[in-house]
Swiss-Prot record:
Pfam families: HD, PolyA_pol, PolyA_pol_RNAbd
Cofactor, how bound (note): Magnesium is required for nucleotidyltransferase activity.
Protein name: Multifunctional CCA protein
NCBIfam families documented for this protein: PRK10885.1
Task performed by this protein: Catalyzes the addition and repair of the essential 3'-terminal CCA sequence in tRNAs without using a nucleic acid template. Adds these three nucleotides in the order of C, C, and A to the tRNA nucleotide-73, using CTP and ATP as substrates and producing inorganic pyrophosphate. tRNA 3'-terminal CCA addition is required both for tRNA processing and repair. Also involved in tRNA surveillance by mediating tandem CCA addition to generate a CCACCA at the 3' terminus of unstable tRNAs. While stable tRNAs receive only 3'-terminal CCA, unstable tRNAs are marked with CCACCA and rapidly degraded.
Residue ranges annotated for the HD domain, each copy included: 228-329
InterPro entries in UniProt: CCA_bact (IPR012006), HD/PDEase_dom (IPR003607), HD_domain (IPR006674), NT_sf (IPR043519), PolA_pol_head_dom (IPR002646), PolyA_RNA-bd (IPR032828), tRNA_CCA-adding_enzyme (IPR050124)
GO molecular function, one term: tRNA binding
Sites where the protein binds CTP: 8, 11, 91, 137, 140
């Protein structure tokens, strides 16, 4: 019976990165032996155990045989006869197929250490093609390790393209796709994930609303990068710089879906694109069962981001309608997220990364002034019923107007 540290912990240590979960592989043991040593079995589909003291995971060495389509159609075989090399062969990437024994000796039968040095994400064997989820995992790894200079090996990218063309991605469940999407959006450079998917054709297969944006031009005056798909990736990168929140980053991803619907004869203008994108966002969120908070913020950003961009041109009454529509009175935190997404949209353009964008600050100040209007004073003044609501709106409008006047004075 031999125990090895495997997977991400070994990879990250060799890269000099913080180690996450420590997964162990046990070769030459039976279920009965593990239980006798005090381990607790937790694996349903294959033998995985928790260490009695550390609670770290220990899995028996196993092989996998494809039976059926998709990423769930596998039959696992675990026995004391399965070797270390056989177990590592079933793994996705060579950099994840390195093992370290209890003496600290590395075992690298498939060249993972060299690929770490070359910064390559390369599949271990042709069996990679049996699991379509690996397309998303490789794209996510490319995003996760982008800062370290990793790229997908050409032969792996070619295999991912073959899998996509064979329709394998159709076998992924919506929940599993969203889980991968959520992981990558919470990472540092999610735009790389979508770029890799586009290279292998998977973006069109999984996220056609996003793929449709590439090649769609926008006015060069406001979008020197021209391409709406490129702009969306730049906005996503800015959103990651501005906010750690999943909903903000997701909203940044979806904010220009409507531009993909503009007929070419109207390019590069996209009048009303925010509203045109709303059905696409709803369908996207329903398809992948996205959390309500992600859906709701994405809809708000698509609908209102152009209003925020021209906030200085809006009448106070129009700005009050924006606050009402966004339910900013009851959901001020979500409105702050909307402003962050708008900041990402503004700065996500070539040459605009460091430009001053004061509109969200003005809008936030106007909202704060309107929120400060005391309802108790209105009631104390004798207003009743519908008159309370009307008087509250009037006083909020006056508060916004004062902010507008003061802001104009400060700017001058």
């Amino acid at each position: 019976m031999q125990t090895y540290l495997v997977g991400g912990a070994v990879r990250d240590r060799l890269l000099g990165l913080p180690q996450g979960d420590r997964d162990h592989l046990v070769v030459g043991a039976t279920v009965e032996q593990m239980l006798a040593l005090g381990f607790t079995q937790v694996g349903r589909d294959f033998p995985v155990f928790l260490h009695p003291k550390t609670q770290q995971e220990y899995a028996l060495a196993r092989t996998e045989r494809k039976q059926g389509r998709g990423y769930t159609g596998f039959v696992c075989h675990a026995s004391p006869e399965v070797t270390l090399e056989q177990d590592l062969l079933r793994r996705d990437l060579t950099v994840n197929a390195i093992a370290e024994d209890e003496a600290g000796q590395l075992h690298d039968p498939y060249g993972g250490i060299e690929d770490l040095k070359q910064r390559l994400l390369r599949h271990v064997s042709p069996a990679f093609a049996e699991d379509p989820l690996r397309i998303l995992r490789v794209a996510r790894f490319a995003a996760r390790f982008h800062a370290q200079g990793f790229v997908v090996a050409p032969e792996t990218l070619a295999l991912m393209r073959e899998m996509t063309e064979a329709g394998e991605l159709a076998h992924l469940t919506p929940e599993r796709v969203w889980k991968e999407l959520e992981k990558v959006l919470l990472g540092p450079t999610p735009q790389v994930f979508f770029e890799v998917l586009r290279e292998c054709g998977a973006l069109a297969a999984l996220f056609p609303e996003l793929d449709a944006l590439f090649g769609v031009p926008a006015p060069a005056k406001w979008h020197p990068e021209i391409d709406t798909g490129i702009h969306t990736m730049m906005v996503l990168a800015q959103a990651c710089r501005l906010s750690p929140e999943l909903a903000v980053r997701f909203a940044a991803l979806c904010h220009d879906f409507g531009k993909g619907l503009t007929p070419p004869e109207f390019w590069p203008s996209h009048h009303g694109h925010g509203q045109k994108g709303l059905p696409l966002i709803r369908d996207f969120c329903e398809r992948f069962r996205a959390p309500n908070e992600c859906r709701d913020l994405a809809l708000l950003v698509s609908d209102l981001h152009t209003h925020i961009h021209i906030a200085f041109e809006l009448k106070p009454a129009t700005l009050l309608k924006v606050f009402d529509k966004a339910d900013a009175w009851r959901r001020p935190e979500r409105f702050a997220q909307l402003l962050d997404a708008c900041r990402a949209d503004f700065h996500g353009r070539t040459g605009f990364e460091e430009r001053v964008y004061a509109e969200p600050d003005y809008v936030a100040r106007a909202l704060a002034a309107a929120q400060a209007v005391p309802v108790k004073e209105i009631v104390a003044a004798g207003f009743k019923g519908e008159a309370i609501r009307e008087q509250l709106a009037k006083r909020r409008l006056d508060a916004i107007s004062r902010v507008r006047d003061e802001w104009t004075f400060l700017e001058d």
